[in-house]
Design a protein with these regions (language model features):
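Conserved, structured C-terminal
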Residues: 1-189
Length: 189
């Protein structure tokens, strides 16, 4: 059995297939054979990263970790603390909201022409380190170098930032919306 979910991690109309691991080779071969007439091709993790960066999709292990709260990660729209019988961790999240957060995620367009932020680069404001890049890459559809970073909360709203990439500080502009298909028209096609 295969469960097909109309969701994906790349911001295009697509499907995730959930199945027993023992079926993967047969399923892959069947889909690849059927897709030949549509010019199906394989693509790898750099392509997936490029696509997810353009949609500002956060990644597990980079933007989303056990040490980062949903509030710090900018995931507020995905939970409701007013519901009865709320989720595990709701009380801790409520406490975090009430006490305030020290860091917040920012989505950045980086002014660079030959190298992109990948993760762990320092983020500067007024020549002081104020955060760290969690991931980044080049958006091939938008022709933009993009990155996520956690910075001090007070700098998360439009401040001028810089990212050190290969020993050079590069300007980074905080984006307030997704750079590719911000209204999710492709996903709703």
């Amino acid at each position: 059995p295969v469960r097909a979910l109309r969701v994906n991690y790349v911001g295009e109309l697509g499907w995730e297939l959930h199945h027993p691991m023992g079926q993967m080779e047969l399923l892959y071969d069947s889909i690849y054979e059927a897709g030949k007439k549509e010019n199906i091709i394989n693509f790898g993790t750099y392509a997936v990263n490029s696509l997810r960066m353009e949609k500002a999709y956060r990644g597990w292990g980079a933007e989303l970790t056990g040490e980062i709260s949903l509030v710090e990660a900018g995931m507020d729209r995905f939970f409701n603390l007013k519901k009865k019988n709320n989720f595990f961790g709701a009380k801790a999240l409520q406490n975090k909201i009430q006490s305030g957060v020290d860091i917040k995620i920012v989505y950045l367009e980086v002014d660079v022409d030959n190298a992109d932020a990948r993760g762990n680069e320092p983020v500067y404001h007024n020549n002081k380190i104020v955060g760290v890049v969690t991931s980044g890459g080049y958006g091939f559809r938008t022709k933009k170098s993009l990155a996520f970073a956690y910075v001090k909360s007070e700098l998360a709203n439009g401040e001028s930032l810089e990212i050190e990439i290969q020993g050079q500080k590069r300007k980074a502009k905080i984006l307030d919306k997704v750079v590719y298909d911000p209204d999710n028209q492709k996903l709703r096609a």
